[in-house]
Amino acid sequence: MQIPLSTFEKKFLSLYFLIFSIIPLHATEMVFDRGIASINIEFANTLNLRKQGLMKRAKLNQDSGMLFIWPEKEQQCMWMKDTSIPLSLAFLKDDGMILEIFYLEPFSKSSVCSSNEVRFALEVNRGWFREIM
């Protein structure tokens, strides 16, 4: 299910992060119009890491997420095959601004695709964005 964002939220709801980190887990801060939230990000910046994603994990720490990085900007699609954790997914612009957020259902094989061409997506525990915004 897609969470609608108002024009105000799309304009001011920004996420800043280090994009090309060689460290697989990196603590970073996300800047929103209502304040700053810290999150530990795992980077999925290779084909194998993007394919694996968060599959076959029992849990995801509340302050953690996975940033998917594709080499080219295009419409991206995600699914929840073999993923038991309820997640929220944000597709991001190059500058980190959140374009759209979706709720993902565990084990779903239905694809959720970005409405725009993107290079980045962030998966976190379901409801995390709502809690910090």
Residue ranges and their predicted role:
Residues T28-M133:
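Compact, glycine-rich, soluble single-domain proteins
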Residues F12-I22:
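Bacterial N-terminal signal peptides
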Residues P4-L5, F20, A44:
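A general, composition-driven signal for non-globular sequence regions
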